[in-house]
UniProtKB/Swiss-Prot annotation:
Belongs to the tachykinin family. It is found in: Secreted. Keywords: Amidation, Amphibian defense peptide, Neuropeptide, Pyrrolidone carboxylic acid, Secreted. Expressed by the skin glands. The modification Methionine amide is found at residue 11. The modification Pyrrolidone carboxylic acid is found at residue 1. Tachykinins are active peptides which excite neurons, evoke behavioral responses, are potent vasodilators and secretagogues, and contract (directly or indirectly) many smooth muscles. GO terms for cellular component: extracellular region. This is Physalaemin. The keyword Secreted applies. GO terms for biological process: defense response; neuropeptide signaling pathway. Transmembrane segments: none annotated.
């Protein structure tokens, strides 16, 4: 379950 929040952290 990939959370969108994690993606934001990469940004």
């Amino acid at each position: 379950q990939a959370d969108p929040n994690k993606f934001y952290g990469l940004m």
